[in-house]
Amino acid sequence: MSESKENTIVLISCVKRKIDTTNGPVPAKNLYDSPLFKKSLQYAKEVLKVGEDRIFILSAKHYLLPLNQPILRYEQTLKNASAKERREWADIVWQQLSKRFSADTKYIILAGKNYLDNLIGSHRISNCQLPLDGMPMGKRLQALNKAIMNKTIL
């Protein structure tokens, strides 16, 4: 990745596994407790060398979520959402991205099908890389582990 990281945004999907927040909100980056989320974040920071201010979580509940945004545990997913609900979710996320970033922003998206389907395309995110696209969960984790270990970009 030779171009400037200043024009690159990494989007990581939220995950089901979360820590307990009965003692109060925690930064979003600390809420999600799955190996896939942790490795995705590690990959973005250590291999892609993107700063935390350029990494966001695609949250089924909170839409575009900065890593340090304090939040409470929640149970919401796009997995069981209707096609209409997923389109509405993508509309909101796209509006947030459009307001925040320029049209020439490059996105690296580490997310599954439910998060990608309505978010990428000619009228949405078109300048993107999907390094984990089409991989089952276990293969994603393997690919991230290997990339982190070898410091190679997927």
Kindly give the residue locations of the regions a language model identified.
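Peripheral peptide segments
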Residues: 1-154
